[in-house]
Amino acid sequence: MLMPRRMKYRKQQRGRLKGATKGGDYVAFGDFGLVALEPAWITAQQIEAARVAMVRHFRRGGKIFIRIFPDKPYTKKPLEVRMGKGKGNVEGYVAVVKPGRVMFEVAGVTEEQAMEALRIAGHKLPIKTKIVRRDAYDEAQ
């Protein structure tokens, strides 16, 4: 599971998911990418599920680039505990994803394989996604 090695502060505030992504909005490493169309927190488990689904589809060959990292801790209080008495314990880590963010990229496979693998990976995520191709515009950047 992906998680930070060490953090300056153990717990964070939730924050808000306003606006579009500030960066990571074009295919940089692979030939095809999976782009988020909605804002969401993507958990480390969801990222791993999508990665495993793509690896299994490719069998051998192909390279997967994970462009998001779960660096935000989220907390949860135990069941049947009254409100108050401080913030809960860290339950896991999430990646904050905004619309337009390229989350996964693939290279070294045919277009049909890439499209199908990214479609399967998209079903593992809690948001709407679309598949994009690296364009001449992207290569110019």
UniProtKB/Swiss-Prot annotation:
Q: Where does the UniProt annotation place the signal sequence?
A: none
Species of origin: Thermus thermophilus (strain ATCC BAA-163 / DSM 7039 / HB27)
- Pfam families given in the database record: Ribosomal_L16 (PF00252)
Entry keyword set: Ribonucleoprotein, Ribosomal protein, RNA-binding, rRNA-binding, tRNA-binding
NCBIfam families xrefs = rplP_bact
Top-down, what is the taxonomic lineage of the species of origin? Answer: Bacteria, Thermotogati, Deinococcota, Deinococci, Thermales
Membrane-crossing ranges are: none
Q: Which HAMAP family match?
A: Ribosomal_uL16
Q: A single GO BP annotation from the record? A: translation
Under the heading PANTHER family, the entry gives: 50S/60S RIBOSOMAL PROTEIN L16 (PTHR12220), LARGE RIBOSOMAL SUBUNIT PROTEIN UL16M (PTHR12220:SF13)
Family per similarity comment: Belongs to the universal ribosomal protein uL16 family.
User: What name appears for this protein in its UniProt entry?
Assistant: Large ribosomal subunit protein uL16
Subunit structure, interactors included: Part of the 50S ribosomal subunit.
Q: Which GO terms describe its molecular function?
A: rRNA binding; structural constituent of ribosome; tRNA binding
Its biological purpose = Binds 23S rRNA and is also seen to make contacts with the A and possibly P site tRNAs.
Which InterPro entries has this protein been placed in?
Ribosomal_uL16, Ribosomal_uL16_bact-type, Ribosomal_uL16_dom, Ribosomal_uL16_sf
